[in-house]
Regions:
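Secretory targeting and sorting signals
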Residues: 2-26
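Feature marking well-ordered beta-strand scaffolds used for ligand recognition
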Residues: 26-463
Length: 463
């Protein structure tokens, strides 16, 4: 279903390891990985990044190996990759693709440790009530405003080999993901925080106290302001309301008192040139006007899509031309064993009105493995439109969608025992952070990469 809402604008409680094994396995193994991701579980099966299947135009180059934690998102700046995991993050010198070097391994537990960088500033998301924002803090119990913290941590990375914790900002429902927008006119960074109350937090989700006035469904994002002159003075800027439908996980897994219904966003993809944001908000995908980034029009979306075939609007991307908005569906229960079912697809929409153009599913049968689109970005500057995507057990896929009506996989890398969380193109190579296998570098030799732009830095959630 598509709703055109306005003219186009110009220009969780962290779970201990395997805590969900009972509820998830009671449903089926296919949904376990999605529940683990949504709720913060850490489970590391074995695997081999150098083995498995790949297309003739994709070649494994190197890896720095696993961390012992769930590996998550990546940001890039210069010759460094900043590689998140639930236990902290690693800084990797990627100047030699055959011999990446870990120059810093920061131990700072806080799922998901979704990561963004700009200049000397690094931001990580913590979606898990801890006893304090300090690195080394354990999960909080009880979870109250007096005893628990979750939100964003901020580090100084002026010396990439020695990141230094600066400060932290509490945000309601924590921070599942973050989108860092430079607002250089005002000498600051604005960090959009997406979160949701799938599990209750200190002032997030259902509550028993009749005097508590917080909204149990959440229905907001948060914006954190970081002054460039003094990042340690970061603070909560605002809490813009959102208008999205209630998403009920029980529709997908059956009754389970461990999880809450909610209204919130998972990923926020910014296109700064267009002044737009594609908001993936569980039960709906929306397009927002962010031409004034400090005052986004979050309650009056330009359009929204809420297709019943989609389990969970998880992530988004604009084509380089700006003509197309892509939403990724993270399935809660499904596999790629029956490709015709279309579980976990990408959905391609017109940017101007939200009309559906096409969908894409990887063409490789993955049996009973959990298989779903996850995180992705474009290969910038090439002729046509080409993206790189992580597909959990489907590995890393390269998709040519120059013909929007007929997107096609043109390359893939699918390591044994892998489950790709994030896969991105950055300066001539593809970098994948795999849940069990860790960070790997892959080379794409396809002609579709010709002419790709080199970037000074990359936060994949910002274009």
């Amino acid at each position: 279903m598509r709703k055109l809402l306005a003219p186009i604008a110009a220009g969780a409680l962290i779970l201990s390891s395997l805590a969900l094994a009972g509820p998830a396995s009671a449903h089926n193994a296919r949904s376990h990985e999605a529940l683990a991701h949504l709720s913060g579980e850490t489970h590391i099966p074995p695997g081999n990044p150098g083995a498995g299947s790949h297309s003739q135009n994709m070649h494994f180059r190197s890896t720095i190996g696993p961390t012992g934690f769930t590996n998550s998102d990546i940001a890039f700046q210069g010759r460094y990759a900043y590689v998140g995991n639930y236990g902290g993050f690693r800084v990797v010198d990627i100047s030699d693709s055959d011999n990446p070097v870990v120059v810093a391994n920061v131990s700072c537990f806080g799922p998901q440790n979704d990561i963004s960088v700009y200049g000397d500033v690094l931001v990580v998301s913590v979606d898990s009530p801890l006893t304090s924002p300090a690195c080394g803090s354990p999960p909080a119990s009880p979870i109250t405003l007096e005893t628990a913290w979750e939100g964003v941590r901020i580090f100084d990375i002026s010396d990439p080999s020695a990141p230094t914790f600066l400060t932290a900002v509490y945000t309601k429902c924590g921070s599942h993901t973050n989108t860092l927008i430079p607002d250089l006119n005002d000498d600051r960074l604005l960090v959009y925080v997406a979160s949701y109350p799938l599990r209750a937090g200190p002032d997030c989700g259902p509550h028993d106290d009749a005097t508590d006035t917080h909204n149990p469904l959440h229905e907001q994002i948060s914006i954190v302001e970081i002054p460039l002159a003094d990042p340690a003075a970061a603070s909560l800027h605002s809490e813009p309301a959102i208008e999205v439908p209630t998403w009920d996980i029980h529709d997908h897994i059956g009754p389970n008192p461990a999880f809450n219904v909610m209204r919130g966003c998972h990923d926020l993809q910014a296109n700064l040139g267009l002044g737009l944001m594609a908001a993936a908000c569980a039960g709906v995908g929306q397009l927002w006007d962010i031409s004034d980034p400090a005052n986004p029009a979050t309650t009056s979306p330009i359009w929204e899509v809420d297709r019943s075939e989609i389990d969970f609007y998880h992530s988004a991307l604009f084509s380089d031309s700006g003509k197309t908005v892509i939403f990724g569906d993270e399935i809660i229960a499904g596999t790629c064993s029956t490709l015709a079912d279309g579980d976990g697809q990408m959905w391609f929409h017109n940017r101007t009105d939200g009309a559906l153009v096409s969908t894409f599913q990887i063409p490789r049968n993955q049996g009973s493995d959990y298989c779903s689109s996850h995180l992705f970005n474009n290969i910038p500057g090439v002729r046509g439109d080409v993206l790189v995507a992580a597909w959990y057990a489907g590995g890393t896929t390269v998709v040519d969608y120059s013909n929007r009506a007929n997107p096609k996989e043109i390359a893939f890398y699918d390591p044994t025992g892998g489950s790709a969380w994030s896969s991105y193109w950055y300066n001539n190579f593809i970098y994948s952070n795999d849940i069990p296998l860790g960070f790997s570098i892959v080379h794409l030799s396809d002609p579709a990469r010709a002419g790709a732009d080199r970037l000074r830095y990359l936060n994949p959630q910002v274009q």
